[in-house]
Amino acid sequence: LFRSGQASTPLAYLIGKTHPDVSYIEVVSSIASKSAGPATRLNIDEYVETTANAASFFSGCTNTKAILILNPAIPCVNMQTTVFATVGQNNMKELKVLVDEIVAKIQVYVPKYQLIVPPTMEDNRIIMTVQVQGLGDYMPSYAGNLDIINCAAIVTAEEYAKKNLKSA
């Protein structure tokens, strides 16, 4: 079962699945500056490269770009990710259905993963935006960028343990 600690990867995958002629994907994420600790700040270049590579790998598009914005606003903003894609043919009907399905699946392990701008076509460009809030249990609710990683790791570890307990 596919589990992603990245908000954009499932969306890029679905764009590639429904639009095999995708020629460009851009991922723009904005996170609260306070949710980016020293380790995050030291690894921004790695995050940007990994995000662009994941968009490419899962969509099949070789021309990808990722941008990360550390927003210093007070009160802190929730994590938000917008995916832009340039496509040839329009297959928005199937994309919208699949995006709704994947959002529901992600919400099982990341309850506050929300589609706030559904897939929209403008000329030959697809735009969609998700917002991720944390549960606010251990970290502030604006730290959705940290919660999505933790939630994906927890559910993956739980599934791994269940599988290994059954085979033992």
Model-predicted regions and their roles:
Residues 1-3, 167-168:
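N-terminal leader/assembly segments
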Residues 2-122, 136, 140-143:
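Active-site-lining helix/loop region of Rossmann-like oxidoreductase modules
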